[in-house]
Amino acid sequence: MPKRVLQGVVVSDKQDKTVVVRVERRFTHPLLKKTVRRSKKYHAHDEANTWSIGDTVWIEEHRPLSKLKNWIVVQGEKRAEV
């Protein structure tokens, strides 16, 4: 079975070797017929502490690394400096 890959934005990088990634999904509400956005936060492993807040990253399912970490960061894009 292939591993799931999700795209999201880093919202926290305070922990060592861990980032918190917010993944947003969109769906049509069955009753209102409107597009609704829902988000969920995932803790992901970042071995080199490369990613910082605002970066767009792709995370992939992995074996459990701790109580909360079941994902690893596989690639991403740095946020543009202003």
Swiss-Prot record:
Superkingdom is Bacteria
The keyword Phosphoprotein belongs to this UniProt entry's keyword annotation: no
User: What keywords tag this UniProt record?
Assistant: Ribonucleoprotein, Ribosomal protein, RNA-binding, rRNA-binding
**What's in the GO CC field?**
cytosolic small ribosomal subunit
Keyword Plastid assigned to the entry: answer is no
What biological function has been recorded for the protein in this entry? One of the primary rRNA binding proteins, it binds specifically to the 5'-end of 16S ribosomal RNA.
Name the PANTHER family for this protein: 40S RIBOSOMAL PROTEIN S11 FAMILY MEMBER, SMALL RIBOSOMAL SUBUNIT PROTEIN US17M
Family, per entry: Belongs to the universal ribosomal protein uS17 family.
Q: Which NCBIfam families match?
A: PRK05610.1 (NF004123), uS17_bact (TIGR03635)
Q: What is this protein called?
A: Small ribosomal subunit protein uS17
